[in-house]
Amino acid sequence: MTRLDRGPASRAACGSDMPAIEVRSLSFAYPGADAAVLEGLDWSVPQGAFALLVGGTGSGKSTLLSLLKPEIAPAGERAGELLVLGENIADMDVRASAERVGYVFQDPENQIVCETVWHEMAFGLENLGASRDEMRRRVAETSYFFGLEDWLHRDTDTLSGGRKQL
């Protein structure tokens, strides 16, 4: 596992030394597995840092990241703590998890559920109870940031794999 840290300046800009993500003594085993895929893992990502999670096939990268989202966490035996901005994910409800932790699947076909790019971008906001005006504003801001303004009314089936991952 490798961590690239932008240093004290980026942490100071966030206003806190509290890690964005903190993993404490995490172990996880899938049901019926002979061995744990994660065992005694300690890892943290400071706020404002850019982190890379690198490892071989089957080393637990996807498992670890899935465990950070209670609503998609795999079944199995887990020990240890996972904290996001100091809050244990075991104590988060679905709304808090959705507001604090995003997850992009490796295969974008598993995450696209709407027919147009605009509706896909608004989907999460709608599920969080955002007003129509807020959805319009935030989709406009995000599409501008990623240069997707011309794509908003396109069918999601016409997007390349890379565009779907955005």
Identify the meaning behind each predicted range.
Residues E109, E115-E126, R136, A140:
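Short helical segment in ABC ATPase nucleotide-binding domains corresponding to the A-loop/adjacent helical element
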Residues E77-N88, S97:
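Conserved ABC transporter NBD signature motif
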Residues K69:
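Helix-to-loop junction immediately C-terminal to a conserved catalytic motif
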Residues D133-W151:
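Conserved ABC ATPase "signature" region
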Residues D155-L159, R163:
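Conserved ABC ATPase signature
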Residues V54-T57:
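The feature captures the beta-strand-to-loop junction immediately N-terminal to the Walker
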Residues R11, G15-V23, S27-G40, I72-A75, ...:
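A short, flexible loop at the N-terminus of ABC-type nucleotide-binding domains that lies
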Residues N88-G102, N127:
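ABC ATPase NBD coupling module
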